[in-house]
């Protein structure tokens, strides 16, 4: 773009002799570059746009909460955990809703295919209505389960269709004792590997609780180690505990085992607080009640620090 000079064109002056003398205007009053002016204007618009964007981001952060989905196996071997959840759910809600701003809770229960059970999955969408959640837990029956594998893949598919908020953090706590079916064994051809990858892309973190007697909760995360977000190598036919380890590790969650059935309550609260960034606050509140550290909560806190470090190294926010 060429430079444009603006000059004053002064009128001609008369000499005493009557002839005209044109006043030279060889000193430009102002020189400016049109491209430069346009660039500055565009820059101003960009800065203004960035300022609006930053304000919107701050506004979103101020209202950011947690979408927590409890996903549980209710087949026969898991009935004791369902009983605990029925009995302790009000306590869980009281703690979490006081601790975590803008919290919503959803529930997905699953059984198995073709085993005469009353359902394959039952879904309660994310809500703040505690009475509705409690009614869902009390009103959903246990089942029996058919083969060794359970309909985990169907529950994961339901999680993909959950009414997630665009603003909130997305967290799943999956508790069970059996792996999903492979694609060929699922009547609906649900592929748990691809569904898990899709959930990860939707920024859903899957924390797992492997429910088996005598399980060392500290070792669960080491049973199948994989980088966060690494879906380059397909997994299949993993053992039950290895599956629960893999799906947590690959989505940036925590895998933990249960030593005693009652531990499930502390673990659910700990996982939710961890994903909401409220683990320290929960620890303080629990210490007031128990007067001693809760081992599962201490472990979750330690694992959360390691995962955050990994995420930073991998470039995840």
Over which residues does each language-model region extend?
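Divalent cation-coordinating acidic motifs and surrounding scaffolds
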Residues: 2-317
């Amino acid at each position: 773009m060429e430079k444009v000079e603006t000059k004053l064109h002064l009128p001609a002056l008369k000499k005493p002799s009557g002839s005209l003398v044109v006043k030279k205007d060889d000193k430009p009053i102002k020189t400016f570059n049109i491209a430069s002016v346009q660039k500055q204007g565009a820059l101003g618009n960009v800065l203004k746009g960035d300022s609006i964007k930053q304000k919107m981001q701050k506004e979103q952060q101020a209202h950011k909460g947690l979408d927590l989905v409890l996903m549980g196996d209710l087949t026969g071997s898991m009935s004791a955990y369902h009983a605990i959840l029925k009995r302790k759910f009000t306590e869980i809600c009281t703690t979490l809703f006081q601790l975590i701003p803008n919290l919503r809770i959803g529930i997905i229960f699953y059984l198995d295919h073709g085993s005469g059970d009353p359902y394959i999955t039952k879904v309660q969408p994310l809500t703040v209505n505690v009475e509705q959640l409690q009614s869902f837990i009390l009103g959903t029956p246990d089942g029996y389960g058919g083969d060794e594998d359970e309909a985990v893949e169907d529950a994961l598919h339901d999680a993909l269709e959950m009414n997630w908020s665009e603003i909130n953090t997305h967290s799943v706590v999956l508790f069970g004792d059996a792996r999903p079916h492979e694609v060929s064994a699922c009547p609906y051809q649900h592929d748990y590997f691809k569904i898990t990858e899709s959930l990860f892309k939707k920024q859903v973190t899957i924390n797992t609780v492997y429910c088996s007697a005598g399980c060392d909760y500290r070792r669960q995360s080491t049973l199948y180690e994989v980088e966060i977000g690494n879906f380059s190598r397909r997994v299949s036919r993993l053992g039950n505990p290895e599956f629960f380890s893999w799906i947590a590790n690959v989505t940036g969650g925590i895998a933990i085992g249960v030593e005693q059935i009652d531990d499930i309550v502390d673990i659910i609260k700990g996982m939710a607080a961890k994903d909401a960034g409220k683990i320290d606050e929960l620890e303080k509140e629990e210490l007031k009640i128990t007067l001693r550290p809760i081992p599962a909560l201490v472990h979750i806190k330690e694992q959360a620090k390691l995962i955050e470090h990994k995420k930073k190294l991998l470039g995840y926010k």
